[in-house]
UniProtKB/Swiss-Prot annotation:
Protein name: NAC transcription factor NAM-B2
Region of interest: Disordered: 1-33
Compartmental location: Nucleus
A Pfam family recorded for this sequence: NAM
Matches recorded under SUPFAM superfamilies: NAC domain
InterPro entries in UniProt: NAC-dom, NAC_dom_sf
Length: 396
């Protein structure tokens, strides 16, 4: 019997996962963003890259930045939306100098500001790196055109770089590129600065256009509302005139009805007339006009022609002494009726009225409403009392 192959019983070798290839996008859960601090970039990425320690995730691409223009770099990155990270070598500008070469394809990078030291967190606050800001200019120095592309360059300090970076060997017939190498790796962040002034002007322009459109859209509504308001004011004024006219009509109708009735019932009819006048709505406006005959005059002269004439009431006699003057009222008092022959006398039911401001009270009791100057001039003559002053001879 042939011996069995010893290798047949051995377990197959385990498959090792291949290392992440350069340029492949990292597999991160949704919602994660790569936005490290300056210290994290230097300590956890640049130092490990310079020491040739493998990184857990290939999230920063190796690109020689100075062989491309900045607007070509975002498509070279494996990760990033508004800012992109790269590992890039640095070369010398001159073989025996220490200045880096900042020239690019169609322009150059110019340093701005001062270098910012990067300190490690902890008690010692050790300096672990340096941060430099650069701006890209189109054209050739020193007359290049400034752009909005910004670079933040992170490099290790001298103590760290002496142990982790490759210094160029002395020139002994080697290649020229090896003699110009200043640093094997620096870490760079690239982004494009947004012009806030232009963005603000654009925002204000859009808001202005929206305001104009809103105003144009709302103008017909305002015009319609204005016309409606004007119509409302006109209708209110018409209703005010109608209210005033109806009040005058009601009052005059009451006077005419009382005149047709003949005032046969005496005080009872007058009381009904006064009550009807008071029941009518008050006028909207009252105009006061001074008069020499009476202090209060409020009605038009048109009502004078329809005032009922006073009737004769025999037996009326009333007198009052005020100081040296004797005021008397008799039933046989003649009244001027404007040229007529009728004789008007004071009715006896007026005895219970006080004598103060007799004309004013008589107007309100008889008419139920105030009179205008022309009306009171005619009405007052009907109630004028003779005045007798002792010691004065009235006969010529």
């Amino acid at each position: 019997m042939g011996s069995s192959d010893s290798s047949s019983g051995s377990a197959p070798p385990r498959h090792q996962p291949p290392p992440p290839q350069q340029g492949s996008a990292p597999e991160l859960p949704p919602g994660f963003r790569f936005h490290p601090t300056d210290e994290e970039l230097v300590v956890h990425y640049l130092k490990k890259k310079a020491a040739k320690v493998p990184l857990p995730v290939t999230i920063i691409t190796e690109v020689d930045l100075y062989k491309f223009d900045p607007w070509e770099l975002p498509e070279k990155a494996t990760f990033g939306e508004q800012e992109w990270y790269f590992f890039s070598p640095r070369d010398r500008k001159y073989p025996n100098g220490a200045r880096p070469n900042r020239a690019a394809t169609s322009g150059y990078w110019k340093a701005t500001g001062t270098d910012k030291p990067i300190l490690a967190s902890g008690c010692g606050r050790e300096k672990v790196g340096v941060k430099k800001a650069l701006v890209f200019y189109r054209g050739k120095p020193p007359k290049g055109l400034k752009t909005n592309w910004i670079m933040h360059e992170y490099r290790l300090t001298d103590a760290s770089s002496s142990a982790t970076t490759s210094r160029p060997p002395p020139v002994t017939g080697g290649s020229r590129s090896a003699s110009l190498r200043l640093d094997d790796w620096v870490l760079c962040r690239i982004y494009k600065k947004i012009n806030k002034a232009a963005a603000g002007d654009q925002q204000r322009s859009m808001e202005c256009e929206d305001s104009v459109e809103d105003a144009v859209t709302a103008y017909p509504l305002y015009a319609t509302a204005g016309m409606t308001g004007a119509g409302a004011h006109g209708s209110n004024y018409d209703s005010l005139l109608h209210h005033q006219d109806s009040h005058e009509d009601n009052f005059l109708d009451g006077l005419l009805t009382a005149e047709d009735a003949g005032l046969s019932a005496g005080p009872t009819s007058l009381s009904h007339l006064a009550a009807a006048a008071r029941a009518s709505p008050a006028p909207t406006k009252q105009f006061l006009a001074p008069s020499s005959s009476t202090p209060f005059n409020w009605l038009d002269a048109s009502t004078v022609g329809i005032l009922p004439q006073a009737r004769n009431f025999p037996g009326f006699n009333r007198s009052r002494n005020v100081g040296n003057m004797s005021l008397s009222s008799t039933a046989d008092m003649a009244v001027d009726n404007g040229g007529g022959n009728a004789i008007n006398t004071m009715p006896p039911f007026m005895n219970h009225l006080p004598m103060q401001d007799g004309t004013y009270h008589q107007q309100h009791v008889i008419l139920g409403a105030p009179l205008a100057p022309e009306a009171t001039a005619a009405a007052t003559s009907a109630f004028q009392h003779p005045v007798q002053i002792s010691g004065v001879n009235w006969n010529p």
